Structures are given as C-alpha cells and as structure tokens.
C-alpha cells in the first residue's frame, strides 16, 4: 500500500501524518480514536494524544500508519530515541514506506544530522516505488522548510530537483513544480528547458506552455514563440491565447497568410464565454494584414467586425481611421473614430498624428497644427512619417520655413515618401 503525505509544516508533521489517507476504510473505533487524537493535539494535551495513538498501534499492529504517527508524536515531544525506534520498526517491515522515510528525514534534520537528512530525502525522492504525488508533497515541504530557515539556500532545493530530474520522469507534476520554483527565484532561463520537459510529457499543459511563451516574448524571439505555439494549438485547440501569440509571431516573421489562417482558426473556437475584446483583437489583426496585402475591402470589413465586438478597440479605431484618411474617403467617420483614440490616450503620438492628418485632409489646418505639435512633443519626432506630416501641416498654415525644416528632417531620417524630395525642391506641399 502507498500512503501520501499532506505536508505543510516545517516540524515533523504529526497533524499531517494524522491526515494521511488510510489504505482501507476506517472502522468506527479508529475514526473516533483519530478524531480524539486530533482534538488532543489541538488542545496541546500530548499525553492523551499519546494514549490514543498507542491504543491504535496495539489494536492494529499491522497498520504501519499508526506506528509512524506514534513516532512523530514522540519526536515532537523530544523522545528522539523512541521516535527513531518506531520509524525503524516500520522500515524493517516496509522499507519503501514513504511516511516512515519522510519522518526519518525529519528525525535526522531535528537531530542535526544534515548529511543523513539529505541522504534520507534522496532515498525517498529517488525511489521508484514512491508515488509522484508523495514526492510532490515532500518537495513542497522541503521548499517551505528552506524558505523558513535562516539560510534560505535555494541551491540545495535546486540540487535536489536536479537529482530527481535525472531519473526517468513520466509525471509532469515534478518538472512543473521545479519550473515554478525556478521562476519564483527569477531564474527564467533555467526554467525554460524544465518547462519544455513539462509540455513534452503533457502537451495539453497550457499553463507551462504560456510560461514558455512569456519567456520567448521577453526575449522578442518570435521563432521560439512559433515553435511553442504551433504544437500548442493542436494540443489545446481552445487556448485562444496561443493563437494570439502565434498570429503576432507570424506577423513579425512576415508570414501574412499564416497570420490570416491562424486568426480564422481561432475564431472557429470562439464560444459564448469568450471575451468580446479577444474576438475583436483577432479581427483587428486580420484588418492590419489585409491592409498590407492591399486588400482594402477585406481590411475595412475586418475592422468593422473588430469594432462590433469591441467599439473601444483603440488599435482598430486608429488604423481604420488612418487608412480611410490616406484614401481620402469617409473622413467624418475617420475623424469620429480617431477622436476616440486621442481621448483614450492623449499622449500617444501615433493617435495624435492620425487625428491631425484627418483634420488636415478635411482642411482644418489650424486645429491639425495643434494636434501635430502635441504628437511631436510626445516622441513623434522619432517617426519620419509624423515629422513629414508636421511639415505638410505647417505649410498649409502658412509656415513655409517650418515646413522645409521638418521635410528636410524627415528626409535625413530615411523617409520613403514618394513626394518628399519634390516638396523640398519646390518648397510647397505636394499630395501623394
């Protein structure tokens, strides 16, 4: 039989041991004795607690659980030799008894025998006959003890995990706990191969896969994002987050058709519970891609869908408005959409530029200048497009000198505008 510890304290966990699941159903007397034992423990009446357990040991001599609990009660009350004898008695009968192995580790730790403590933990954690659940419980206990100790030496915990990982592991719980521990210590790079082992063992583990995605996003490694997400959407086809990251990564890799297909696949898995903002984002990405492919009707249809699901989708509002203004069509609709973005993010140079440009296309030059100046104040001078727009707007407000200054600056920044050189030569605005 295998018993599984519920470890949550740094002392030899008598209460924990008491809550081990028995291998068989308890009789009424046993249930009563165990309940009394727990109550006596809570009341700190160790003498009566002793008596209850001793009576259970006598009544059920073949049930090793009670022998271990008796040892734990001895240890908690400073009767170290009696505790040792109780554990050894159990291990003589059941050498792989996880309760007794763990209690022996506690015994060695309490008696200051650090090397034996480590050896005992290895005996338990590297034992193929001990269940993964038990090992997980023990490692959680080890982590708690390590965090509570004055030394707080995470290298010991990591070394223990590493020894476990060298075995043939077929349960993803162990590498998952290890990766969570590494992440808690800000060791993200070290956690990556461990998380990869988790998803190899359990491709449906979405949490581990998203941690891998997060690590790749921080490194801006779109190839790694693709590598992690492609099998992810096969294993967990309902995980819309994976489609989203995959779409962004394909976009960076300039795989435009792949972006469209992954967004379409994501939309097939939308349910009544899916957040409307998420659906909107997929349509918005599709709008951006259709625009790069010069499929403007499809782009506008996608943006319309995005705004049906989330009328406040700022990215969709801005891009939709800007592309309309470039085509010089539906300018009132474009202005309305763009104004929402400026209201939502008044210091965003991209949104300020879009709004200024729409006002420019509508002939509202004085107002356009106010917004383009704001865009320039908010990092807009780093964009050759915004700088050129600034020159265009300045020209239309009668400031030819200012216009030339910004047009020349845009040219120096490497602008690919078709009319920019002509504007500088002729000293006047020329529409593209």
Question: Each predicted region: which residue ranges?
Answer:
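Alpha-solenoid helical repeat scaffolds
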Residues: 1-397, 405-432
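Residues that scaffold, gate, or flank divalent-cation-dependent active/transport sites
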Residues: 401
């Amino acid at each position: 039989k295998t018993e599984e510890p519920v470890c949550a304290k740094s002392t030899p966990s008598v209460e924990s041991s008491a809550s081990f699941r028995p291998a068989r159903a308890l009789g009424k007397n046993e249930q009563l004795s165990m309940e009394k034992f727990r109550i006596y423990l809570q009341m700190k009446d160790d003498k009566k607690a002793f008596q209850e357990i001793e009576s259970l040991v006598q009544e059920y001599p073949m049930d090793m659980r009670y022998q271990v609990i008796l040892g734990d009660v001895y240890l908690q009350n400073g009767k170290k030799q009696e505790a040792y004898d109780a554990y050894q008695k159990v291990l003589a009968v059941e050498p792989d008894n996880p309760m007794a192995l763990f209690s022996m580790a506690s015994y060695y730790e309490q008696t200051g025998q650090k090397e034996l403590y480590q050896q005992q933990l290895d005996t338990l954690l590297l034992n193929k006959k001990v269940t993964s659940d038990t090992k997980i419980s023990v490692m959680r206990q080890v982590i708690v003890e390590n965090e509570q100790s004055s030394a707080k030496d995470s290298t010991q915990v990591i070394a223990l995990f590493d020894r476990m990982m060298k075995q043939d592991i077929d349960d993803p719980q162990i590498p998952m706990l290890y990766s969570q521990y590494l992440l808690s210590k800000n060791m993200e790079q070290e956690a990556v191969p461990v998380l990869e082992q988790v998803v190899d063992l359990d491709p449906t583990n979405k949490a581990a896969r998203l941690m891998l995605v997060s690590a790749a996003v921080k490194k801006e490694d779109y190839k790694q994002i693709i590598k992690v997400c492609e099998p992810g959407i096969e294993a967990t086809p309902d995980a819309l987050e994976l489609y989203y990251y995959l779409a962004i990564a394909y976009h960076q890799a300039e795989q435009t058709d792949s972006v469209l297909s992954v967004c379409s696949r994501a939309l097939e898995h939308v349910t009544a519970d899916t957040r409307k903002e998420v659906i909107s984002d997929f349509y918005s990405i599709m709008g951006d891609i259709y625009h790069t492919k010069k499929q403007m009707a499809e782009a506008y249809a996608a943006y319309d869908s995005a705004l049906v699901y989330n009328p406040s989708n700022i990215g969709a509002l801005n891009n939709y408005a800007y592309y309309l203004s470039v085509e010089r069509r539906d300018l009132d609709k474009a202005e309305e959409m763009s104004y929402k973005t400026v209201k939502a993010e008044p210091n965003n140079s991209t949104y300020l530029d879009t709004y200024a440009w729409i006002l420019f296309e509508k002939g509202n030059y004085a107002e356009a200048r106010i917004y383009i100046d704001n865009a320039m104040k908010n990092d807009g001078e780093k964009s050759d497009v915004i700088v050129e727009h600034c020159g265009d707007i300045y020209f239309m407000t009668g400031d030819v000198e200012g216009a030339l200054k910004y047009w020349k600056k845009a040219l120096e920044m490497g602008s690919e505008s078709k009319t920019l050189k002509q504007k500088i030569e002729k000293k006047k605005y020329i529409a593209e």
